Curated annotation (Swiss-Prot):
UniProt superkingdom: Bacteria
Protein name: GMP synthase [glutamine-hydrolyzing]
Annotated positions binding ATP: S222, G223, G224, V225, D226, S227, S228
GO MF, one example: GMP synthase activity
GMPS ATP-PPase domain sequence ranges: 195-384
């Protein structure tokens, strides 16, 4: 029985969001490139198909298209934005360039309030973002919604199970968008909302057992969300046949190494090899000021230490990696958005003779967090902000010394502590302190000081590709600043970074 939806990706900026929204409605969903052969789509046995939006015009040279036979499968199809224009164009309708682009929140006048629009009002708000529009619907199609400037904002052909909308139901700016998707999934496709993290974990554990058998497995554990959840999931499947290697390179946040040991060794009773490599990493970084060089040294040294430790474990065939679905999508579709970590120290070399276990490769980040909670990981790990592989090395500008690391660790700890206490930590994508290579004059007591400046950075983001700075309350910033200057020796000034990405990156180095 069909139990999933296929999203065909035409390169729209919201394509991944469509998949995430469908999964939030507890229906499993996969993304495939728009040019996936029809036989492959049929083999997948989907209960529904969604055509995503995209930047192209159906009349453009090399415009993405689909095999027209897809419309004869009698599988329910929902075309969104470009997906609607393509459906109209291929089935004999007329698509024209709009005189002006319709962009932003727009009143939607619903002409037929059953099936796709069941339970909605006659007028709803929708999010439009298009340059072309459907001027004439194909034969057999009923126009079901319009806007002031778009006479055909939605259309359907019930006999052929074809539905289309010109707006974006997947974005939050279409308030009833989730209801529309729900109607498509549950009422039109007849799918059951039974895809949960509990069912995913059970299936993943079975598959890991089948893949690994009695073989030994190793995992490079960073203490971040992805590697932590992957490690616990694999451990549930194979127990003591998994060994995790945790390398403390001396560039971690305050209490981080201790928390990893406490969580994985004590709480989960896992085989954990703890490598204290602080001295050798800091020795290699002595005198190095260039950020790219720092990154390369840390990456190279990490691989060397990991290989040494893995070799001590004897004959190991499998390596666990915390690859996520956006990485898979990015490598699989030329039109998809690029989502890649620029700081992945755990990027082990391709010539290592391991077979990969990637138990999270079908999940988005929010699903990984949900799975972590399902598996019993503490919230402090599950909700941890992204942390660069090179650690504090890219937050200490200029040369790295023990003194600078100690100052930054304490300042960062205070910043995060206050964000957690005030309820702001979970509202931010990433927050951290930076130690710029900058000293300034100050007065403390009656003494003149010449000490370091701490810069604070807090941003909101969906995926790290773009970010906006968080408008933290002045009272909170004042409290954080007073604590850092009062409690961290060697600091006499605190500044707050109010730059978005772009033009700045999230990290300073």
């Amino acid at each position: 029985m069909a139990s999933k939806v296929i999203v065909l990706d035409f390169g729209g900026q919201y394509s991944q969001l469509i998949a995430r929204r469908i999964r939030e409605l507890k229906v499993y969903c996969e993304m495939l490139p728009y040019n996936t052969p029809l036989e492959k789509i049929v083999q997948e046995n989907p209960g529904g198909i969604v055509f995503s939006g995209g930047p192209s015009s159906v009349y453009g040279e090399g415009a993405p298209t689909v095999d027209p036979e897809i419309y004869r499968l009698n599988i329910p199809i929902l075309g969104i934005c470009y997906g609607m224009q393509l459906m109209a164009h291929q089935l004999g309708g007329i698509v024209r360039p709009a005189e002006g682009r319709e962009y932003g929140k727009t009143p939607l006048f619903i002409l037929n309030r059953d099936r796709l629009f069941a339970g909605l009002n006659e007028t709803e708000i929708c999010w439009m973002s298009h340059g072309d529009f459907v001027a004439k619907a194909p034969e057999g199609f009923l126009v079901t919604a319009k806007t002031e400037y778009t006479p055909i904002a939605a259309m359907e052909n019930r006999e052929r199970n074809l539905y289309a909308v010109q707006f974006h139901p997947e974005v939050v700016h279409t308030p009833k968008g989730k209801e529309i998707l729900k109607n498509f999934l549950y009422e039109i496709c007849g799918l059951t909302p039974d895809w949960t993290m509990e069912s995913f974990a059970q299936k993943a554990i079975r598959e890991i057992k089948e893949q690994v058998g009695e073989e030994k497995v190793v995992c490079a554990l960073s203490g971040g969300v992805d590697s932590s959840v992957a490690a616990v999931l694999v451990h549930k499947a194979i127990g003591d046949n998994l060994t995790c290697i945790f390398v403390d390179h001396g560039l971690l946040r305050k209490g981080e190494a201790e928390e990893v040991v406490r969580t994985f060794k004590e709480q989960f009773q896992m085989n954990l090899v703890f490598v204290d490599a602080k001295e050798q990493f800091l020795a290699k970084l002595k005198g190095v000021r260039d950020p790219e060089q720092k990154r390369k040294i840390i990456g190279h040294e990490f691989i060397r230490v990991f290989e040494e430790e893995a070799a001590k474990l004897g004959d190991i065939r499998f390596l666990v990696q915390g690859t996520l679905y956006p990485d898979v999508v990015e490598s699989g579709t030329a039109t998809a958005a690029t989502i890649k970590s620029h700081h992945n120290v755990g990027g082990l070399p391709e010539d290592m003779k391991f077979q990969l276990i990637e138990p999270l490769k079908w999940l988005f980040k929010d699903e990984v967090r949900e799975l972590g909670l399902e598996l019993g990981l503490p919230e402090s790990i599950v909700w941890r902000h992204p942390f660069p592989g090179p650690g504090l090395a890219v937050r200490v500008l200029g040369e790295i010394t023990e003194e600078k690391l100690a100052i930054l660790r304490e300042a960062d700890y205070i910043f995060i502590d206050e964000l957690k206490k005030s309820g702001w930590y979970r509202k931010t994508w990433q927050a951290f302190a930076v130690l710029p290579n900058l000293q300034s004059v100050g007065v403390m007591g009656d003494e003149r000081t010449y000490a370091y400046t701490i810069a604070l950075r807090a941003v909101t983001s969906e995926d790290g590709m773009t970010a906006d700075w968080v408008r933290l309350p002045y009272e909170l910033l004042e409290k954080i600043s007073a604590r850092i200057v009062g409690e961290v020796k060697g600091v006499n000034r605190v500044v707050y970074d109010i730059t978005s990405k772009p033009p700045a990156t999230i990290e300073w180095e």
